[in-house]
Regions:
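Phosphate-group recognition and catalysis centered on beta-loop-alpha active-site segments
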Residues: 2-329
Length: 329
């Protein structure tokens, strides 16, 4: 009899705990988030490639593009402006210094993959980079043809040119090296341009050292490290977000939610959004997570339907050409 009573008491305690956790993380009891989702156009408008074939940090992705249906190249003025016109609320660009002290938009460590040049980007002068054809190395058939050759001559822009092309829309600057001096160089360009980078909401990400440095310079702007900081926040929240306590790793940080891993996010969406807003953190929804691969953005329009209607954070997008207009319908 006593044993039976103890079992009932234990069961009652479990039920109360489960009920408490349910209410604590109940999204329907949280306030409705204000605002709409914001699209981050990764690389602006660019040539999508076969992600399964082109893997690895140093893989030449230009060798694996899908048959091209446009002549717009990543990290160019046309790419940035078109991405904004298609609905990109923020356009992601890659920055790299030149041999003669300038700073340009270019993704790769060397120019060998995409262009008709050779060598590291940092070992070339601005005039040498401007002379290159950035469409030279693109092929969709394993090198049998190069349909974009001659289409990208002189299109590598300086950061100053990019700022002038996007005076009213925020940019997300990606540091491509671990050198914190590049943060100083970029910040000096922003200051000299007269751009109101704080009001516009420009943001920065990349390796830890340049991110830490830009935080010291642009103290009111969003800066983050995707590999360590965002990963820690996301993992920590999944582990003990059920308590209602937001991990310290998320404070003023970034929580990344793969489209296929929304289910372990406690209080998703409304309660989670309120918690992150309470500690100054941003949320980024990205494309499907695949084990052993880095996160990519959304490229399938149908994935938009998997995001809760009340979500008001950021969505990382690969194919802004398709995703942008679809979200605005």
């Amino acid at each position: 009899m006593n044993l039976s009573r103890r079992k009932k008491q234990a069961l009652s305690v479990v039920v109360v705990i489960l009920l408490g956790l349910t209410l604590l993380n109940a999204t329907w009891l949280a306030p409705s988030p204000a605002g709409k989702p914001k699209l981050i156009a990764h690389r602006g408008v660019y040539h999508l490639y076969n992600k399964r074939a082109a893997f690895g940090r140093d893989t030449c992705t230009a060798r694996f593009i899908h048959p091209p249906d446009h002549e717009v190249f990543e990290n160019t003025i046309a790419s940035i402006q078109m991405a904004a016109g298609l609905g990109g609320d923020m356009v992601e660009i890659d920055v790299a210094p030149t041999k003669d002290g300038k700073m340009v938009l270019f993704h790769d460590w060397t120019v060998d993959c995409r262009t008709n040049g050779k060598g590291e980007t940092r070992d070339l002068t601005l005039s040498e980079l401007k002379a290159l054809d950035i469409g030279y190395g693109y092929t969709a058939d394993g090198g049998k043809s190069f349909p974009l050759r001659g289409k990208g001559i002189g299109q590598i822009p300086t950061v100053e040119e990019a700022l002038a092309a996007m005076p009213a829309r925020p940019l997300l600057f990606n540091f491509k090296s671990k050198n914190p001096d590049e943060a100083d160089q970029l910040f000096a360009i922003l200051k000299a341009s007269g751009r109101d980078y704080e009001k516009l909401g420009d943001a920065f990400y990349g390796a830890q050292r340049p991110v830490d440095r830009i935080r010291q310079l642009a103290t009111k702007n969003w800066a983050f490290n995707m590999k360590n900081e965002a990963k820690s926040c996301t993992k920590d929240y999944v582990l003990y977000g059920w308590t209602g306590i937001v991990p310290e790793s998320c404070r003023n940080g970034v929580l990344v939610i793969p489209i296929n891993y929304q289910w372990p996010m406690w209080g998703w969406p409304n309660r989670l959004i309120a918690r992150m807003e309470g500690v100054g953190a941003k949320i980024i929804v990205v494309g499907p997570h695949e084990s052993g691969k880095s996160n990519e953005g959304l490229s399938d329009v149908h994935d938009l339907g998997k995001i809760p209607a009340s979500y008001n954070g950021y969505i990382w997008v690969e194919d802004i050409w398709a995703i942008g207009p679809a979200l605005r319908r």
